[in-house]
Design a protein with these regions (language model features):
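A short, hydrophobic C-terminal helix/tail in secreted or cell-surface proteins
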Residues: 192-203
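N-terminal secretory signal peptides that target proteins for export/translocation
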Residues: 1-7
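Bacterial N-terminal signal peptides
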Residues: 9-18
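Serine/threonine-rich, low-complexity intrinsically disordered segments
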Residues: 8-9, 23, 116
Length: 204
């Protein structure tokens, strides 16, 4: 493991038809951890296999819509080419629990170079989109496991934050993202970038 530290943000979105959800009704929770091990079955995609384990609770009656892993922050010098070269994954990228209870939901992974317009983010991010069916969809709570590969060895995640955002509402929640991430050859964030580590939630 090298001495670099990586700053990342993970954001999840809940489906909603409301324009605003009150703070009292939206006590959400999200937490994730990334682990790494030498790749033994997909070495053509990268020498290292990374696994993101995620738990969520939207705190409302609205189910998970999708979630984003924000990789590059304002002031950083990573570009889309850096990420395209550094990250690989299979289809589906992962799986989570679903509703009704006992079913499983698969997810597609997308590298979005222009961010997520639903919350006015224009930075590089990895989007995890559920492949829904009439028989199984993500719920208001759940757990998921997602896998990607890289030629770059793991580096500790520094000053992480995890945010759960209602896609059509005003709620933003933050929780811990721990573990490791590929030690990218670029800098995902500027040294003066804002740290969200102590912020639990905010309402715009």
């Amino acid at each position: 493991m090298n001495g670099r530290r990586i700053t990342l943000s993970l954001m999840a979105f809940a489906s909603s038809s409301l324009l605003f959800i009150s703070p009292a009704a939206a006590d959400c929770l999200i937490a994730g951890s990334v682990s790494a091990a030498p790749s033994t079955t997909q070495s053509c995609l990268g020498a290292w296999e990374y696994t993101l384990s995620l738990t969520w609770d939207t705190g409302t009656r609205y189910a998970l819509s999708h979630f984003d892993l924000l990789i590059a922050h304002p002031g950083g010098n990573c570009n889309c080419q850096n990420l395209n070269q550094a990250l690989n994954w299979l289809s589906p990228i992962g799986i989570s629990s679903g509703e009704p209870a006992g079913c499983s939901v698969s997810y597609e992974g997308f590298l979005n170079c222009t961010g997520d317009p639903s919350i006015d983010i224009t930075d590089l991010l990895l989007k995890f989109e559920p492949i829904e069916s009439a028989d199984c969809k993500p719920g208001t709570t759940g757990q998921g496991t997602y896998t990607f590969f890289s030629a770059y060895p793991p580096a500790p995640i520094s000053e992480p934050n995890l945010s759960l955002v209602d896609k059509f509402g005003q709620l933003v929640c933050y929780g811990p993202l721990t573990g490791v991430f590929p030690g990218l050859p670029c800098d995902p964030t500027a040294t003066e970038a804002r740290s969200w580590g102590s912020q639990k939630a905010s309402y715009r």
